[in-house]
């Protein structure tokens, strides 16, 4: 007999309904939680004979955000809307639970739903227009809101790093040699001519369109004042899994046309490496030391994909060719029978709500990932130990020593070690993608292919 998991009325949703009705009047007649890892809902409110469609954005949860105050994002969206940037209208902010109540912007992000290539290209250019408009906004309203204004070229370029680093340092529980290597390279190679700060989304390329029209930009959780080319770089990364609608190089040229800014492709490449690095730092502790309640499948997916982007972006910036190492694969490990039993037991669990089904799928994805680890993880560690011993010219008695020694080495090594260190990290991540890339969690990492800048 299948196991039935009963669900009850969610007290969080009751609080949100009560708040919305008190804020706007009327009656909430429909409320749907979105099937994603972050709490979010779409609502319909009946008021004065009309239907008002709303979206509620809840707290991310955990300690993975450089700007954890959700109210900050609500205030940013309000400022942007007041200055003509297409963003959702903000109706209010709920304190318990913390959540933004905003307009539900219609449309889709998936550009494959456009009617033609012509429409896709037009939509992509409308997004560039909106981003460029944002980059020209006066900064004083944002400064008055408490957003830091960087002034020197180094501060402007490294604004994202400075925002994310305290989060990384506070939560760091284990050595992170790749992140420390990337940080060292980025700090040594700051472009010194980027002296104009702008308001940036810092996780760009997120927009909704309908009938060939961009109706809104969304997700300003990480927005700050920094180098406008950081937005081009983060959108370039996003193009891997959420296509922008046209070739990135063409959109970058269009951005230059709209803004009058000269081409600076090396800086876009630099910011690609920087954004990938701070994004990896953001989730590194959540994967190294998992916390109860975290979306473990999502954070593991982010971790392996972002680490691969760090390596690819650094290789591009350094002019080093990518290499895929050879690896003898094994299909199953010593715990294969037990994992098969666990998968079967999981398949016998039935849940009622669609949301709980997503939770069950998350467990299934972790189990699939674990199966590949059971088959290959020890071999991966053996290879990593051999390579680290050669580079560091010492013998390790235990695999657990490697990351600590590598981190200490990258912090003291000079630029002459950049290439051998990058090649070591490249071999590590490429082998892991060979092992885990066929899983649902590893699929994103297997599709990493940064589009050309020019």
Predicted ranges, named:
Residues 333-365, 370-454:
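C-terminal amphipathic alpha-helical interaction region
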Residues 26-31, 261-269, 399:
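Short, surface-exposed acidic
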Residues 12-26, 139-203, 211:
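An alpha-helical support segment within catalytic cores of ATP-dependent transferases
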Residues 317-340:
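Charged, amphipathic alpha-helical linkers/stalks
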Residues 64, 223, 242, 267, ...:
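Short, solvent-exposed segments of well-ordered alpha helices
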Residues 229-263, 274-295, 302-318:
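Active-site activation/catalytic loop segments of kinase-like enzymes and analogous catalytic loops
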